[in-house]
Amino acid sequence: METKNAKAIARKVSIAPRKARLVVDLIRGKNIAQAQAILTFTPKVAAPVILKLLNSAVSNAVNNLKLNREQLYVKEVFVNEGFRLKRMFPRAKG
């Protein structure tokens, strides 16, 4: 039987990847109810963003793939580095 995977992607989130990885490592491998409870009570800046992303992935699984919500778990979650803003410090360079 083929396993079905639902995914969600958050782009252009202005949180440091190192800080977001601390939160993501807490929910890897957990079922959805546990992951949502962990993210709700985690006092980190990245927690609400990752909770919103998790809820989006759950909605994709339930609505698009017709999967049972109670059987869902976090199979894979990762954080990569996004774009950087180019800054300039105006100063004489000669």
UniProtKB/Swiss-Prot annotation:
The keyword Lipid biosynthesis does not apply. SUPFAM superfamilies: Ribosomal protein L22. GO terms for biological process: translation. The gene is rplV. Keywords: Ribonucleoprotein, Ribosomal protein, RNA-binding, rRNA-binding. It comes from the Bacteria. Part of the 50S ribosomal subunit. GO terms for molecular function: rRNA binding; structural constituent of ribosome. This is Large ribosomal subunit protein uL22. Belongs to the universal ribosomal protein uL22 family. GO terms for cellular component: cytosolic large ribosomal subunit. The keyword Ribonucleoprotein applies. InterPro entries: Ribosomal_uL22 (IPR001063), Ribosomal_uL22_bac/chlpt-type (IPR005727), Ribosomal_uL22_bac/org-type (IPR047867), Ribosomal_uL22_sf (IPR036394). This protein binds specifically to 23S rRNA; its binding is stimulated by other ribosomal proteins, e.g. L4, L17, and L20. It is important during the early stages of 50S assembly. It makes multiple contacts with different domains of the 23S rRNA in the assembled 50S subunit and ribosome. The globular domain of the protein is located near the polypeptide exit tunnel on the outside of the subunit, while an extended beta-hairpin is found that lines the wall of the exit tunnel in the center of the 70S ribosome. CDD domains: Ribosomal_L22.
